[in-house]
């Protein structure tokens, strides 16, 4: 009986989905090109139009307010409101909302501790958790129906009021810059400015080599000067590698999120109704992965910023 009941439930959901898929395929743009069917009004989906730059929907003086900027503000507002709701009237014995907030914080803290250790976990937690929550919230909120469907008219034309923030290259770039600043300031604060910068620019061995030459120790002096130049060159490469992190952060997030949005738009257009549902599930997974990668790499770089120094002490 239990087996037949489960089968009936599966058929109850599977058959309507299959019917919707068949209708969407036959009468949608893809099926109409094969069978010559006419697309009914309820299946008509606007043709996908990909615009990489964010569209301005308003102006404040010379400052353009774009739809991705509005989406970013909306994400921040949602995070603030949710944090207030989940942490309202906190008690020693947590309720459901407080337990949910504690589970999120504890999960992120355990994630940070697993990489940085307890010594540095709390110092790195705020930056890493903020980046994770902001990136994943941008990704998940963009899947709601009102993103792209609510339009406004401006002097430049009619545009969507909300557009996925992560699909504007400026948003991933701004997060990457903040990640870079967070890691570098953390390294300077933890070790001291001069100590931290000495990993990149260090003339001590080169100066020591010249001192050896003045003392008449030619072999040792030349050796120290040569290795001093090598260390200086390696330091310049290290500076360059730190700067290029921002580029890799930016285009990884921007590329994956933009590709996901295009995939959903195209699948919804070709076969309306249910064909795009699996891709929404895929975007949920990709949003989580991208948030983990962005915050995880920030965590790793923050840990590396102090680890080599501690090993030499």
Predicted stretch roles:
Residues 1-313:
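Selective transmembrane helix interface/packing segments
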């Amino acid at each position: 009986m239990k087996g037949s009941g489960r089968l009936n439930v599966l058929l109850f959901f599977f058959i309507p989905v299959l019917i919707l898929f068949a209708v969407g395929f036959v009468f949608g743009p893809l099926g109409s090109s094969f069978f010559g069917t006419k697309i009914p009004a309820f299946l008509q989906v606007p043709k996908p139009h990909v615009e990489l730059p964010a569209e301005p929907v308003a102006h404040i003086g010379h400052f353009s307010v774009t739809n991705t900027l509005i989406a970013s503000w909306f994400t921040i507002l949602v995070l603030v409101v949710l944090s207030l709701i989940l942490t309202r009237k906190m008690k020693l014995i947590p309720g459901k909302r407080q337990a949910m907030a504690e589970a999120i914080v504890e999960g992120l803290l355990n994630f940070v501790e697993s990489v940085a250790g307890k010594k540095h976990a709390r110092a790195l937690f705020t930056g890493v958790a903020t980046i994770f929550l902001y990136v994943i919230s941008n990704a998940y909120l963009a899947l709601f129906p009102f993103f792209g469907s609510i339009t406004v008219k401006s002097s430049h034309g009619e545009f969507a009021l909300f557009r996925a923030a992560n699909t504007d290259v400026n948003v991933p770039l701004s997060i990457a810059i903040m990640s870079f600043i967070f890691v570098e300031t953390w390294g300077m604060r933890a070790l001291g400015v001069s100590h931290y910068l000495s990993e990149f620019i260090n003339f001590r061995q080169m100066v020591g080599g010249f001192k050896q030459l003045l003392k008449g120790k030619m072999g040792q002096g030349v050796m120290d000067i040569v290795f001093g130049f090598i260390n200086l060159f390696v330091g310049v490469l290290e500076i360059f590698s730190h700067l290029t992190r921002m580029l890799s952060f930016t285009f990884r997030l921007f590329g994956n999120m933009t590709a996901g949005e295009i995939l959903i738009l195209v699948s919804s257009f070709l076969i309306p109704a249910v064909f795009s549902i699996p891709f929404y599930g895929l975007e949920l997974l990709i949003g989580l992965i991208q948030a983990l990668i962005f915050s995880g790499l920030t965590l790793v770089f923050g840990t590396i910023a102090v680890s080599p120094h501690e090993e030499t002490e």
